[in-house]
UniProtKB/Swiss-Prot annotation:
GO annotation (BP), single: adaptive immune response
Stretch forming the signal peptide: 1-18
TM annotation in the entry: none
Gene3D superfamilies: Immunoglobulins
Entries under CDD domains matching the protein: IgV_TCR_gamma
SMART domains per the UniProt record, alphabetical: IG, IGv
Protein known as: T-cell receptor gamma chain V region DFL12
Taxonomy, superkingdom: Eukaryota
Keywords annotated in UniProt: Adaptive immunity, Immunity, Immunoglobulin domain, Receptor, Signal, T cell receptor
Residues forming coiled coils: none
Amino acid sequence: MLLLRWFTSCCLWVFGLGQLEQTELSVTRETDENVQISCIVYLPYFSNTAIHWYRQKTNQQFEYLIYVATNYNQRPLGGKHKKIEASKDFKSSTSTLEINYLKKEDEATYYCAVYSSGFHKVFAEGTKLIVI
């Protein structure tokens, strides 16, 4: 099974397809709850790849949020309350964005991204967060 996953990752990497996947198109949470948004990374060198997270609010430009380079290199945003955190799980080749203490203004579409072939940035499909 591991060999199949590696082969698929390599083929997708060569053709530049399917490098990132956000399986949930949308998630709904209530105010003051937390949410986790996952991004599966189909790259042969996941452990050395920095995963970047962005959001886009309705009718606004992309906003850069956070990146994670290794499992121990999280860069929390939001002071002591850690409003936004990012992490990597090497076993599942997944990066997770966690947004805590949700407010209505957190409503947006969230995207993971990686740099591919130098300076070419590849984005996943995005996950729309709805806060009620």
